[in-house]
Amino acid sequence: DIKNPISTVTNTKPITKTTEHVFFKLSSYQEFLKKWMDDNDIQKEIKNKLSEWLSGGLVDWDITRDKPYFGFEIPGLKDKFFYVWLDAPIGYIASHKNYCDKNNQNYLDDWTEGSKTELYHFIGKDIAYFHGLFWPAMLEGSGFRKPNGVYCHGFLTIDGEKMSKSRGTFFNARTYLNHLQPDYLRYYFSSRLTNKIEDIDLNFDDFMARVNSDLVGKIINIGSRCAKFINKDFDNQLSAEIGNNELLESVLSKKSEIIDNYEARNYAANMRVISSLSLSLIHI
């Protein structure tokens, strides 16, 4: 035990208080969550982790916090706020409604039970239980449809180290965008991203090599060379016929593999397939 605890923020001693809280009856959704995980697309590693919660029996979830607290104050309850992970996922529905309102669509077409829309969440591995237990139970209890799948990724490290502002090992998106195109980074992440729960390391030497060698040197090079020939010799007009059916068939033969890789969320495998195709085209 700490003999003389003092808050480093307020310089005062903590005291014991009695308070009332509101709970979400998560325990009532035990069987529903088991079935939902079995019927939908959840990675094996994440499913095993979530099953540990279920095997011990779910307990009801405290969804309130006392003032001072950030977030939404609960109407009718004095100095009580919703716990941030209760209201945060609801932002998915709110942001989608905002999009639909701007495009003359009804957001409920996508969020009601029986909707044909496929709904997937892509999240970090540290918030799997919020999206794999609490959120589906909330949706079930409120009559909304549930996600078709939840895909978890690992963390992003910088040159082999965890992100830390104090140590300077962090990545500022705005600074990056002030100097380089976002597609370079999208390609780099795609070339490293599999369907496993693995961290991705952003190494800038590797980033530069992959972008220059694979993206620019192979894939973009094809478009650049073709554009010059089409402009110079063919008045910017494409042929109405395929002059090399064997080449076309070799490219189309990879169609199913590419589709399967995307369905499996194995983006790195697809980048290798596409890079291999581009290399074969360069050497024609």
Feature roles, as predicted:
Residues 205, 235-259:
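Acidic, turn-prone loop/beta-hairpin segments
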Residues 5-232, 239, 270-274, 279:
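Structured secondary-structure scaffolds
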Residues 1:
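Cys/His-rich Zn2+-binding cysteine-cluster or related metal-binding knuckle/ribbon modules and their
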